[in-house]
Curated annotation (Swiss-Prot):
Keywords: Cell junction, Cell membrane, Cell projection, Coiled coil, Cytoplasm, Cytoplasmic vesicle, Cytoskeleton, Endocytosis, Endosome, Lipid-binding, Membrane, Phosphoprotein, SH3 domain. This is Protein kinase C and casein kinase substrate in neurons protein 2. GO terms for cellular component: adherens junction; caveola; cytoplasm; cytoskeleton; early endosome; endosome; recycling endosome membrane; ruffle membrane. Residues 25-274 form a coiled coil. Residues 11-282 form the F-BAR domain. One of its GO terms (molecular function) is phospholipid binding. Ubiquitously expressed with higher expression in the ectoderm, the neuroectoderm, and dorsal mesoderm layers. Residues 417-477 form the SH3 domain. It comes from Xenopus laevis. Residues 163-218, 314-412 are annotated as: Disordered. It is a peripheral membrane protein. Belongs to the PACSIN family. A motif (NPF1) lies at residues 356-358. A motif (NPF3) lies at residues 408-410.
Length: 477
């Protein structure tokens, strides 16, 4: 991100105001935060799309299983037809949720990804071009004023020191007059010292006043230049805020599938909440709390006070707030250099990858001959025994784990490739049953190439096969 401004070294900060030396960095950091927020929003949509896919699969499996049970059961007539319509409804809802999943990934996710790529341009040395341009603009605008401010601080310090010395010399002269042992020569030296200290005080005072006047003369131009760079940053943030609002409204439209009043009211409230977002209001808040709208304790002439043993520095009056350090993924020792080069980007990416896993290989589910026999047995059993509901999948004869993938409407062609040895760059804990877990530095075998969602299939040393994020490993040389 932004570097430390050289000319600000030694300048004491008296407040948290935007106008203080170096306090523009919060505005520069907001640009980097915008890139991270794009990743956060993409992962949020990614995870919701996965939920939609899993729910659609469960509805299809449920409808297929219960169609067979009702057909072979004792129910008949219009009630049987009505019962069948319940499964037909599930199939249609399943299709709708698959459409939602596709819309979220193919439209909303891709739209954010493309906008982020167009808005932020990475540099070879790390960071983003937009961040560096803003930082350079602020530093250039602040450099002349910061230099004058350092001169004011130095002049004030010299003046206050001279005043203190004058006070001490005057006190010694007064005490010496009351001392009968003090000879005229010594008294004359003290008087000369008092006179010299008064002259020094006057000179340093004049220099202090002159440097302060020079600073006041450069302040209007300083404010104008800083305001100009800040407005450029505001325009960039305005585009991001407006884009996020637009994307959120599109996501809301894709999610709103229900005509039931209770669901409709939820989506009305969601739409109202999103449409209540106002980019201009956000920009106004940032301006008043972190920008030119903040109050400023402009430097003024401060006379020396005899009651003070020392002068409070600008830093002692109010220390600036410490920055916030983002922490991310753990890594092996041999990858520390890579992490240092890309710490800002990787810390965000890794945290999001861990918390928002998503894979698009479809789980295959169908009913084989063995399950058909189970269905027949259950159907005949339920004709003579009352049914008892249980959520325990281990006792469910129609558990999806007993099925194969011959007739699964969600099945996709698997990607094949030669087996390649890879090494984990970071720790990863699988979030689903079909995902692998490993530690940084651990080696495994990649058995399928990366899919369109960024996942690979691999095999651990113990033989376990599953999915893992492609950017969590590197090829073993």
């Amino acid at each position: 991100m932004s570097g430390t401004y050289d000319d600000s070294v030694g300048v004491e900060v008296s407040s948290d105001s935007f106008w203080e030396v170096g306090n523009y960095k919060r505005t520069v950091k907001r640009i980097d935060d915008g890139h991270r927020l794009c990743n956060d929003l993409m992962n949020c949509i990614h995870e919701r799309a996965r939920i939609e896919k899993v729910y659609a699969q469960q509805l299809t499996e449920w409808a297929k299983r219960w169609k067979q049970l009702v057909e072979r059961g004792p129910q008949y007539g219009t009630v049987e037809k009505a019962w069948h319509n319940l499964m037909t409804e599930a199939e249609k809802v399943s299709e709708l949720h698959l459409e939602v999943k596709n819309a979220l990934m193919n439209e909303d996710f891709e739209k954010i990804k493309n906008w982020q790529k167009e808005a932020f341009h990475k540099q070879m040395m790390g960071g983003f071009k937009e961040t560096k341009e803003a930082d350079d603009g602020f530093r250039k605008a602040q450099k002349p004023w910061a230099k004058k401010l350092k001169e004011v601080e130095a002049a004030k310090k010299s003046y206050h020191a001279a005043c203190k010395e004058e006070k001490l010399a005057t006190s010694r002269e007064t005490n010496s007059k009351a001392d009968p042992a003090m000879n005229p020569e010594q008294l004359k030296k003290l008087q000369d010292k008092v006179e010299k200290s008064k002259q020094d005080s006057q000179k340093t005072k004049e220099k202090y006043e002159k440097s302060l006047k020079d600073l006041d003369g450069t302040t209007p131009q300083y404010m104008e230049n800083m305001e100009q760079v800040f407005e450029q940053c505001q325009q960039f943030e305005d585009k991001r805020l407006s884009f996020f609002r637009e994307v959120l409204l599109e996501v809301e439209k894709h999610l709103d599938l229900s005509n039931v009043e209770s669901y409709a009211s939820i989506y009305r409230e969601l739409e109202y909440a999103i449409k209540s977002a106002d980019a201009m209001e956000d920009l106004k808040w940032f301006r008043n709390n972190h920008g030119p709208g903040m109050s400023m304790n402009w430097p003024q002439f401060e006379d020396w006070s005899a009651d003070l043993n020392r002068t409070l520095s600008r830093r002692e009056k109010k220390k600036p707030t410490d920055g916030v350090t983002l922490t991310g993924i753990s890594q092996s020792g041999e990858q520390s250099s890579i992490q240092n080069q890309h710490s800002s980007h990787l810390s965000v990416q890794s945290a999001q990858s861990t918390n928002n896993p998503f894979e698009d290989e479809e789980e295959t589910v169908s009913i084989n001959e063995t399950e058909n026999k189970k269905i027949e047995n259950v159907g005949s059993y339920e004709k003579t025994h009352p049914a008892e509901w249980s959520d325990d999948e281990s006792n469910n004869p129609f558990n999806p784990s007993d099925t194969n993938g011959d007739n699964n409407p969600f099945d996709e062609d698997a990607l094949t490739t030669l087996e390649v040895r890879v090494r984990a760059l970071y720790d990863y804990d699988g979030q689903e049953l079909d995902e692998l877990s490993f530690k940084a530095g651990e080696e495994l075998t990649k058995i399928e190439d990366e899919d369109e969602q960024g996942w690979c299939k691999g095999r651990l040393e113990g033989g376990q096969v599953g999915l893992y994020p492609a950017n969590y490993v590197e090829s073993v040389q």
